[in-house]
């Protein structure tokens, strides 16, 4: 059983080296780490030249695409499983790969994503949002969960998510030419094809952002656009209720702790 890790990067700093060190210290080791590097002044090839299991594929900035770049890397791999990560997500311990792989023992499961824990400098709103989207309880999600979970049935995050490669290829992989949300679009297709997605709450990465109001608005706007652009996945599945539930719970949390 072989696992390859795929990480798109752009102007990476020291956090990438720490990420690679943590990946190569896992109880279940990756066979190969494929870095999809968008060219910049940072000489990624030179920085990583001494890393034996790291391959760097460089592309021009205009070539980068959230879905297409990841799909290109997937097709360079012959591993059994593909772990996609972002350059700013760090394994919380040495058991990330082992625990993320475990749900695949259920033959329905063709994708599994990790729990995201906030960084120490994370703001209170983002910290609460992380706990809302990434709770302490693991769950297997499939088509029969749609009445209960709605659009969250399709939720999956390529900040840290593993996929069975054979099914990934047979399903057509990530959508090409998409500004955002390639993970959820693919996951929705999986569920609609009769497969399941696992949320592995014991597989943890440290990953959060301190978005400004305008940045959060832009992200939400892009998310909405991606859903409109893919009615074959999202048509007839309401997302407003989940958003309203998050707003209400966040407001109640802020009132309870006395922070805006």
Residue ranges of predicted features:
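Short, well-formed alpha-helical segments that are part of the catalytic scaffolds
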Residues: 12-25
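A conserved acidic beta->alpha catalytic loop
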Residues: 37-45, 90
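Glycine-rich, basic loop-to-helix element that forms the pyrophosphate-binding segment
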Residues: 60-77
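Short aromatic/hydrophobic "clamp" motif used to bind/position activated sugar donors
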Residues: 82
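Conserved donor NDP-sugar-binding/catalytic core segment of glycosyltransferases
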Residues: 90, 94-127
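A recurrent flexible, glycine/aromatic-enriched loop bordering the glycosyltransferase active site
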Residues: 143-163, 179
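Acidic donor-binding loop at a coil-to-helix junction in glycosyltransferase catalytic cores
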Residues: 179-186
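Non-catalytic, C-terminal membrane-associated alpha-helical segments of glycosyltransferases
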Residues: 219-225, 229, 236-260
């Amino acid at each position: 059983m072989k696992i390859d890790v795929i990480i798109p990067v752009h102007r990476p700093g020291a956090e990438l080296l720490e990420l690679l060190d943590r990946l190569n210290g896992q109880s279940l080791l990756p066979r190969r780490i494929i870095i999809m590097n968008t060219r910049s002044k940072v000489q990624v090839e030179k920085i990583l030249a001494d890393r034996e299991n790291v391959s760097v594929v460089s592309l021009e900035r205009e070539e980068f695409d959230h879905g297409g770049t990841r799909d290109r890397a997937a097709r360079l791999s012959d591993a059994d499983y593909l772990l996609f990560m972002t350059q700013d997500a760090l394994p919380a311990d040495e058991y990330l790969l082992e625990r993320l792989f475990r749900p695949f023992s259920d033959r329905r499961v063709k994708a599994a994503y990790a729990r995201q824990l906030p960084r120490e400098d994370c703001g209170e709103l983002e910290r609460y949002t992380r706990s809302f989207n990434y709770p302490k309880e693991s769950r297997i999600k499939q088509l029969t969960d749609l009445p209960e979970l709605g659009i969250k049935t399709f939720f999956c995050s390529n900040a840290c998510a593993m996929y069975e490669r054979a099914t990934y290829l047979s399903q057509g992989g990530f959508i090409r030419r998409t500004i955002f949300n390639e993970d959820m679009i693919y996951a929705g297709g999986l569920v609609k094809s009769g497969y399941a997605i696992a949320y592995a709450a014991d597989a943890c990465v440290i990953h959060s952002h301190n978005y400004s109001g305008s940045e959060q608005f832009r992200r939400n706007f892009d998310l909405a656009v991606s859903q409109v652009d893919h009615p074959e996945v999202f048509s007839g599945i309401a997302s407003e209720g989940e958003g309203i539930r998050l707003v209400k719970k966040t407001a109640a949390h802020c009132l309870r702790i006395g922070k805006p």
